[in-house]
Amino acid sequence: MKKLTFEIRSPAHQQNAIHAVQQILPDPTKPIVVTIQERNRSLDQNRKLWACLGDVSRQVNWHGRWLDAESWKCVFTAALKQQDVVPNLAGHGFVVIGQSTSRMRVSEFAELLELIQAFGTERGVKWSDEARLALECKARFGDAA
């Protein structure tokens, strides 16, 4: 069976999803999984994330080190998800057990952007036009921005 995905935005979309499920013939030897979840982060949210991370990486020295945007992403996602660390295989460092931002729901991603904004603002980050616009849209339109 091919994978079906429905974005339910109206009663008509909802009925289409219900109809698709009703067409499935149950087979106890080959169960089908139906998952209902909030949609994952959008490409627009991802663009906003990297604009903000770039600003933080250029302006914030973290414990005597300048981190790149990718490293900051790890720091922020670890803080948001209260993640854990484990020793690396060589035993000379640590690895953060994390969550991929591409798997985050829209609301989780919005929380991540809020965390970055609060952190950067506390440290006097001057937001670039792209990041500032992204943060203003988030403030104005909420998670849909």
From Swiss-Prot:
Listed Gene3D superfamilies: NinB
Organism: Salmonella phage P22
Identification of the protein by name: Protein ninB
Coiled coil: none
Pfam families: NinB
Lineage summary: Viruses, Duplodnaviria, Heunggongvirae, Uroviricota, Caudoviricetes
Assigned protein family: Belongs to the ninB family.
